[in-house]
Structure formats: structure tokens, C-alpha cells
A protein has these predicted regions:
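Acidic, polar low-complexity linker/tail segments
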Residues: 1-19, 30, 34, 42-51, ...
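Cofactor-binding loop segments of dinucleotide-utilizing enzymes, especially the Rossmann-like FAD-
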Residues: 55-57, 118, 147
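Short hydrophobic beta-strand that contains or immediately precedes a catalytic carboxylate
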Residues: 20-24
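Von Willebrand factor type A / integrin I
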Residues: 132-181
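Exposed acidic/Ser/Thr-rich ligand/metal-binding surfaces
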Residues: 92-141, 172
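Von Willebrand factor
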Residues: 73-111, 153-156
């Protein structure tokens, strides 16, 4: 007997996600790099917890440079950091460096890691795969935004992109401004 009791379920409070961007600035990405950097700069202004990196053959953290309120000084800082801009790409090596250094401090289960790259890499594909597997162990979400994916008849045929796909939560198009929104 008695009256039925209705338990109120408590919902967990929504916690903000930490956004970490890694932007490929190698030669094959030179057409898109400026737009992606503007996108990342806007993200950094909108979210004080966001973190940002450039990569080509090496990885460079650009968070502080993008937060500089003096635009000319920020551009100067970026140009000093981006030595190698428009050159080759070693995505796997750069991702591995990110995982073994910065990810320990800036990536956890509330993080979303956004990689802006076409996937063209001079490393062996297993280097990308191993790095993304290690990053996945940190509990983050991973989004790979590829500007080539918006092309008609695009298929991820590069070895590096194929190696990355199984580790991603989302493989998205990034060839228009609306794709980045």
C-alpha cells in the first residue's frame, strides 16, 4: 500500500567543452591557411579556454599570440613562429609531439580536438594512427575538418587520412565559411 513516490532525477550540470585546434599550414594547405587562422583567432576571442596550434613539419603553440590585443604585434609574433609555413607536412610527428607534451596539460575528457588539415602527410600512416590512438586515451572528442572533403567525388585516398578515420568522432567538410560555423 501507500502512495507512489516520484523521484526527481537530478541532471548533471552542463560543463563547457575545452576546444583545442590544430591547423595544418603546410604547402598543400596554403590556400586555406589564412581563412583557418582567422577562424581560430575568432574562436580564441570568443572562448578564453580555447587552445591553438599550427603544424607543418613541426608543431607550434600559437594561443598567446592570437590573444594579443595588438593585431600588428600578433601578426609579427605569428610570423616569427610560423617558420616553415607553406612547406612540407609531418602530421603524424606533430600529432605525436602534441600528445606527448601539450595534451597532457590541455586535453581531458571535456576537450574537443579539432584538426584542420587535408591529410597529406610525408610520414608513414601508422605514425598518425598511433598518435590519434594515444590522444583518444585522454578521453577527448576528435573532429577532423578537411577542406578537400567538400569537393565533388572526394574520397579519403591518402594513406594518412585513411589511417586517421577510424579514430575520429567526426570527419567534416571545411572548404567554405559556412562549414566552419
Amino acid at each position: 500500500g501507500g502512495e507512489p513516490i516520484h523521484f526527481l532525477k537530478k541532471r548533471r550540470p552542463e560543463r563547457t567543452r575545452n576546444i583545442v585546434t590544430l591547423c595544418d599550414v603546410s604547402g598543400s594547405m596554403s590556400l586555406y591557411a589564412q581563412v583557418f587562422l582567422a577562424f581560430i583567432a575568432g574562436l580564441m576571442r570568443a572562448d578564453q579556454k580555447a587552445d591553438a596550434y599550427l603544424f607543418h613539419t613541426r608543431l607550434v603553440r600559437i594561443t598567446e599570440a592570437l590573444r594579443d590585443r595588438d593585431a600588428m604585434r600578433a601578426i609579427g609574433r605569428m610570423s616569427l613562429m610560423a617558420d616553415g609555413f607553406g612547406g612540407g607536412s609531418k602530421i603524424g610527428v606533430c600529432l605525436d609531439r602534441f600528445v606527448s607534451s601539450y595534451a597532457r596539460r590541455f586535453v581531458d575528457g571535456r576537450s574537443v580536438v579539432v584538426i584542420l588539415s587535408d591529410g597529406y602527410d610525408t610520414d608513414q600512416p601508422q605514425v598518425i594512427s598511433k598518435a590519434l590512438k594515444k590522444l583518444r586515451k585522454r578521453g577527448c572528442r576528435m573532429i577532423w575538418m578537411n577542406p578537400l572533403k567538400g569537393w565533388r567525388n572526394y574520397a579519403p585516398v591518402t594513406a594518412g587520412m585513411k589511417a586517421a578515420l577510424p579514430h575520429l568522432d567526426l570527419f567534416a567538410t571545411a572548404n567554405t565559411l559556412s562549414d566552419l560555423a
